[in-house]
């Protein structure tokens, strides 16, 4: 199976408004706190109390804002 490819904004495409908007949600902010150790994490580790569909939504918002990088290999990001 071919890994899924995601769009990640370049530095020029990023905007402060989008980054701050992505971080304004308490759930996404907690996800970033968990990522702050600098290690790679399985996406399901980021918010273990959320349904997968909700978690996918939040990881997409963070990725599209340029806050996180998602690798389409399993669920690690």
Model regions: which residues?
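A ubiquitous, low-specificity "background" feature that marks scattered single residues
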Residues: 31, 63-64
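Short, Lys/Arg-enriched N-terminal segment that forms or immediately precedes the first helix
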Residues: 2-20
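N-terminal helix-turn-helix DNA-binding core of bacterial DNA-binding proteins
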Residues: 14-54, 73-77
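Beta-hairpin "wing" of winged helix-turn-helix
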Residues: 64-74
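Short, hydrophobic-biased segments on the C-terminal half of alpha helices
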Residues: 59-60
């Amino acid at each position: 199976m071919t890994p899924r490819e995601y769009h990640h904004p370049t530095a020029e495409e990023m905007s402060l408004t989008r980054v701050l908007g992505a971080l304004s949600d308490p759930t996404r902010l907690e996800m970033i706190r968990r990522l702050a150790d600098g290690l790679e994490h399985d996406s399901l580790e980021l918010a273990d109390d959320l349904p997968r569909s909700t978690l996918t939504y939040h990881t997409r918002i963070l990725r599209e804002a340029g806050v996180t990088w998602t690798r389409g290999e399993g669920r690690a990001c």
